[in-house]
Amino acid sequence: MGKNVVVLGTQWGDEGKGKIVDLLTEHAAAVVRYQGGHNAGHTLVIDGEKTVLHLIPSGVLREGVQCLIGNGVVVAPDALMREIVKLEEKGVPVRERLRISPSCPLILSYHVALDQAREKARGEQKIGTTGRGIGPAYEDKVARRGLRIGDLFHRERFAAKLGELLDYHNFVLVNYYKEPAIDFQKTLDECMEYAELLKPMMLDVTAELHQLRRAGKDIMFEGAQGSLLDIDHGTYPYVTSSNTTAGGIATGSGVGPMYLDYILGITKAYTTRVGSGPFPTELFDDIGAFLAKRGHEFGATTGRARRCGWFDAVILRRAIDVNSISGLCLTKLDVLDGLETINICVGYKNQDGAVIDAPTDADSYIGLEPVYEQMPGWSESTLGAKTLEELPAAAQAYIKRIEELVGAPIDIISTGPDRNETIVLRHPFA
């Protein structure tokens, strides 16, 4: 029998999911994206060559792996085609390997215009979105007025729906935000061009996944962003617009929870966050700058500098519960090399002095102070280590303490950006 393995982020995104998905797809027949859009940025390094993916699943660089985009993903046709062409220029036969659900909501120019106009209007109170139209596209979906990829192949029906949508959204853009209107004919013509390009890649992804499952094939489910950015379970309102936690798999792919065999939670050996929102362990000192520089902490999608802080066991415990995590993958351990002491956040202290667990909304984080447990660092290099025994004793103790604090095993340790710089203690597909 095949196994269905999930890879998802347990922090605020940017945990290193792309590398791990790429590593594990050696065993998979298919990789499926089930939520988010091209706001994701998954970086792969193979033999020193770097590839950044936004919409296309991270298995695309492996021959014989089918890459699927499930119905829960919002698709910007222009961004998708740019990504396809860029990979094809490197010799990757993307159109042979990629199939897309016609039920995916479309991100069009008016979604991008709305997203950017809102962030501009919020000023200092902005959420910190990527400005790529993700939120407005999900809003249209939930309001049951959105256009889907499948609509592209019925020109008259598409044109009628597009006209109604532009009447609605242009009214807001022009009258409320004082921004220019989106042109109907230009948008329609562009969409019809994309229709021709996308049609050969259409597939009932849900049916395909169940066919693969019944045939005993291994399937990888690739999450985007991180658990603390989940629309329901994250630090609301500083969240994304989809369910980044395990619940999003069933709704975004059509594969129910009973069929999921192993859920791998990816966590950095420290913590980062992009954009606005609470971050209890954030560092504003030289160590924060050290982590950012050593870890190359700049967003793969936006290029924005990431905020850096100590490892937070509190948010990880919440993520483990919410996702039913089977095991963890600890990434970027090598970034901590050379630090004399390392702190782990074990709780939050409120203004009354009581130690509490993770709050459920952003406002409740105000006034909380992290409670730290200090551990010795290590001077030796962990970069490229392939076995646990190669790691310094202090690094092994750090890993063991994290396991104790969060109540989940660390099954994989990443010791560098390349797919081969990895220690696998328990393989998810085993």
From Swiss-Prot:
What is a single cellular component term in the Gene Ontology annotation?
Answer: cytoplasm
| A Pfam family it matches | Adenylsucc_synt
| Biological pathway | Purine metabolism; AMP biosynthesis via de novo pathway; AMP from IMP: step 1/2
EC number in record: 6.3.4.4
The catalytic site is made up of 14, 42
Residue positions annotated to bind substrate are 300-306
- Enumerate the SMART domains for this protein: Adenylsucc_synt
Known catalytic reactions: IMP + L-aspartate + GTP = N(6)-(1,2-dicarboxyethyl)-AMP + GDP + phosphate + 2 H(+)
A GO BP annotation:
'de novo' AMP biosynthetic process
Recite the UniProt keywords alphabetically. Answer: Cytoplasm, GTP-binding, Ligase, Magnesium, Metal-binding, Nucleotide-binding, Purine biosynthesis
Task: List where in the cell it is found.
Answer: Cytoplasm
Q: Which residues bind Mg(2+)?
A: 14, 41
A GO molecular function annotation here is: magnesium ion binding
| Cofactors | Mg(2+)
**Amino-acid positions noted as binding IMP in the UniProt annotation, renumbered to this chain:** 14-17, 39-42, 130, 144, 225, 240, 304
Which InterPro entries has this protein been placed in? Adenylosuccin_syn_GTP-bd (IPR018220), Adenylosuccin_syn_Lys_AS (IPR033128), Adenylosuccinate_synth_dom1 (IPR042109), Adenylosuccinate_synth_dom2 (IPR042110), Adenylosuccinate_synth_dom3 (IPR042111), Adenylosuccinate_synthetase (IPR001114), P-loop_NTPase (IPR027417)
Q: Which family does it belong to?
A: Belongs to the adenylosuccinate synthetase family.
Q: How does it assemble?
A: Homodimer.
| Name by which UniProt lists this protein | Adenylosuccinate synthetase
Q: Which organism is it from?
A: Pseudomonas fluorescens (strain ATCC BAA-477 / NRRL B-23932 / Pf-5)
